[in-house]
Regions:
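Short, charged recognition helix plus adjacent turn
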Residues: 1, 64-68
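A short, Lys/Arg-rich alpha-helix, primarily the initiator
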Residues: 1-17
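Central "turn" residue of the DNA-binding helix-turn-helix
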Residues: 19, 30, 41-42, 59
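Short alpha-helical DNA-recognition segment
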Residues: 19-35
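DNA major-groove recognition helix of helix-turn-helix/homeodomain DNA-binding modules
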Residues: 49-64
């Protein structure tokens, strides 16, 4: 039985709502623009620390950005 949960996100929508570019958000949380792009496209799941930093930078709750 393969019940692997896949973390999905609304990061792009939340970022655009704040009128931030990928590069600007990346600078705010201390990662590369490529990392933000990879999270937005589901190619990379952020660590708990990075997810928290993204929530703080976007002034959103975890469940507003990330879901299963």
């Amino acid at each position: 039985m393969n019940d692997k949960l896949e973390l999905k996100n609304n990061l792009k929508e939340m970022r655009m709502e704040k009128k931030l570019s990928q590069a600007a958000l990346a600078d705010l949380v201390g990662v590369s623009r490529n990392t933000i792009s990879s999270i937005e496209t589901g190619q990379f799941n952020p660590t708990a620390k990075l997810a928290l930093l993204l929530c703080i930078a976007l002034d959103k709750k975890f469940e507003d950005i990330f879901y299963f």
